[in-house]
Amino acid sequence: RGKYRFATAAIKGTDKASEDINLTCHLDHPRPGANDNASGCVAILEVARTLQSLIDDDLLPRPSRTIRFLWPAEIEGSIMYLAEHDDPSRIKANIHMDMVGGAPVTKSVFRISGGPYSVPSFIADVGHEVGRFVNDQTKRYADGEDVAFALVAPEGGKEPQMALMEGLDMGSDHDVFFEGTWRIPGLYLHDWPDRYIH
């Protein structure tokens, strides 16, 4: 039996360090894909870098739980990760990013999707509330209002980020975390449709 290896990083938690909050994406794809899924890979790398920088600068307290960043090989890699995990019940949530780089020019819509009713959790509620906040702040900024959190990159576009909040949406690596063997709640961040997929 062979060994499965993939890129991973972690921000160690404090009092609940043995519990994980995962951020996942898939690192590879059979065809070139800046959006599918280099965008998800870069997004979780940037989340890791930003959180660690804020912690190092004492602008954000170290999290209670460990935040683990995973770059496995598509669905098969996620299955292997869970199957070989010492105790998957320690994974308290999974936030998956697959195709998060679309823009209005590609006619894609950013979506924040929750999990199935069979894996009840407040995770989707939190994700949807953050999404509504971002929608509100970026829309008001685009309309010329002075807002506390413009949430735009200086070198980026000034159009609002208008995410859709959805229930369960399948079709990526996050599916296996919801599966009955593991029943790990989570969010799926993605854009769809994508005119240029594969």
Residue ranges of model-derived segments:
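A generic short-segment signal for beta-strand/edge and adjacent turn/coil regions
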Residues: 34-40, 62-67, 153-159
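Metal-dependent peptidase/peptidase-like ectodomains
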Residues: 1, 16-18, 72-186, 193-197
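Short helix-loop-beta-strand segments that form the rim/entrance of peptidase-like active sites
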Residues: 50-80, 87-89
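Soluble metallo-hydrolase cores and metallopeptidase-like ectodomains found primarily
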Residues: 1-35, 45-59, 66
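Gly/Ser-rich catalytic serine loop of serine hydrolases
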Residues: 29-42, 74, 169
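A structural signal for well-ordered alpha-helical segments within the folded catalytic domains
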Residues: 41-45, 175
